[in-house]
């Protein structure tokens, strides 16, 4: 199966932000969609600063979306927003925790500074990025769809 790279862009990040913002609330539990949208430009700036130095290289769609979602969740939580209770389930909380932990681990370790090679293996759902002698990031998809 041919490997088709995509590139992370600020537009990708904005799309992901808009897809998840509707179910976030402020610390008082009130839906704050319009307020968060006012924060969108600042959040996008942080997402952009996070993406471009490290991820302006071809990566797969699944990894791109996961990294954007996880990082945006980190940014929203840092601003005091919480998931809307109606949208939460035990499964979604556990999945989000795994995803965010994985994104933070990769960010903190610097493991996601991608090298020149990218490989996608079918069947096992494993993504490996990096180059010989360089940093390599490996993602396996669980039955719940979390990457880490």
Regions found by a protein language model. Give the residues of each.
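Conserved short "hinge" loops at termini or chain/domain junctions
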Residues: 1-67, 128-148
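Short loop/turn elements at secondary-structure junctions
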Residues: 3-4, 78-148
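Generic beta-strand or strand-like secondary-structure segments
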Residues: 42, 46, 71, 75-79, ...
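Ordered, amphipathic secondary-structure segments that act as subunit-interaction surfaces
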Residues: 53, 65-89
């Amino acid at each position: 199966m041919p490997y088709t790279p995509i590139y992370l862009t600020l537009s990708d990040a904005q799309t992901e932000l808009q897809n998840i913002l509707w179910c976030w609330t402020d610390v008082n539990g009130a839906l704050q969609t319009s307020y968060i949208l006012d924060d969108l430009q600042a959040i996008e700036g942080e997402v952009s600063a996070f993406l471009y130095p490290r991820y302006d290289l071809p990566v797969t769609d699944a990894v791109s979306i996961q990294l954007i979602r996880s990082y945006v969740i980190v940014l929203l939580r840092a601003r005091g927003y919480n998931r809307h209770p109606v949208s939460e389930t035990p499964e979604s909380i556990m999945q989000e925790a795994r995803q965010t932990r994985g994104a933070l681990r990769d960010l903190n370790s610097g493991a996601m500074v991608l090298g020149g090679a990218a490989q996608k293996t079918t069947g096992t759902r494993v993504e490996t990025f990096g180059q010989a002698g360089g940093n390599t990031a490996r993602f396996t998809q669980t039955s719940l769809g979390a990457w880490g």
